From Swiss-Prot:
The keyword Transcription regulation does not apply. GO terms for molecular function: dynein intermediate chain binding. It comes from the Eukaryota. It is found in: Cell projection, Cilium, Flagellum; Cytoplasmic vesicle, Secretory vesicle, Acrosome; Cytoplasm, Cytoskeleton, Cilium axoneme; Cytoplasm. Interacts with ENG/endoglin, TGFBR2 and TGFBR3. Interacts with PPP1CC. Its main location: other. It comes from Sus scrofa. InterPro entries: Tctex-1-like, Tctex-1-like_sf. Belongs to the dynein light chain Tctex-type family. Transmembrane segments: none annotated. Keywords: Cell projection, Cilium, Cytoplasm, Cytoplasmic vesicle, Cytoskeleton, Flagellum, Nucleus, Phosphoprotein. This is Dynein light chain Tctex-type 4.
Length: 219
């Protein structure tokens, strides 16, 4: 049997039945076969990772966990209520509703009963000057400070009586009383239907003071 030749056709048939025998013939004695040599021929991945995922698999674990409905970056869309367009959102994600804007309250003219009353303003101005100059004496170095104090005092007294939305402009002319004559003019650009003024003069043994207050309706 050992020296009997095997026909060529039968030899190819035996090699086809046992491909490992063919590899063992070409392998030198004493060498173990590698994984590539023992794997059957045919299409297939070359690694264990490839055998699990496949050559055409391109997704990652992050994408597989995110799901098909995930948004950009792999984040799932929120399940909370979606506020309408233009609404505000609180820190908790709940809609706050549109911001309420107060209606404009401006007026082009004073409301009925809220106009400037010149006679009432003049009485208040005279009382303020009399209280501020009761025992005052004229000193040139202190005349400026005294005039500013009289302006502030007159503004406080008239602010309590003036109608709302009115701005007050006060001026005081202060001088020594020495028998001279003085004329204090006043000129302003205003609305004769809404604006007004009050003027008062107070004198004592040492000085005189002329105060003028313009009440201007301002909106």
């Amino acid at each position: 049997m050992a020296g009997r030749p095997v026909p060529a056709g039968r030899q190819e048939e035996e090699l086809a039945k046992d491909p490992g025998q063919k590899l063992s013939l070409a392998r030198p004695p004493g060498r173990l076969p590698s994984i590539d040599e023992t794997r059957p021929a045919g299409p297939g991945p070359a690694s264990r990772r490839g055998s699990v995922l496949g050559p055409a698999s391109s997704f990652s674990r992050r994408n597989s966990l995110a799901g098909a409905g995930a948004g950009p970056g792999g984040r799932r869309p929120s399940l909370g209520p979606v506020p309408p367009l233009g609404w505000r959102v609180s820190f908790s994600g709940l809609p706050l509703g549109p911001a309420r804007r107060p209606a404009p309250s401006y007026r082009t003219e004073p409301a009925p009963g809220e106009r400037w009353e010149a006679a009432r303003a003049q009485r208040a101005l005279e009382a303020a000057l009399a209280a501020g100059l009761r025992d005052a004496r004229y000193v040139g170095a202190e005349a400026g400070r005294l005039a500013r104090e009289l302006c502030d005092l007159a503004r406080v007294h008239l602010r309590e009586l003036s109608p709302p939305r009115y701005k007050l402009v006060c001026s005081v002319v202060l001088g020594p009383r020495a028998g001279q004559g003085v004329h204090v003019p006043s000129r302003a650009l205003w609305d004769t239907a809404c604006d007004g003024l009050a003027s008062a003069t107070v004198t004592n043994a040492s000085l005189f003071a002329v105060a003028t207050v313009h009440g201007l309706y301002c909106e």
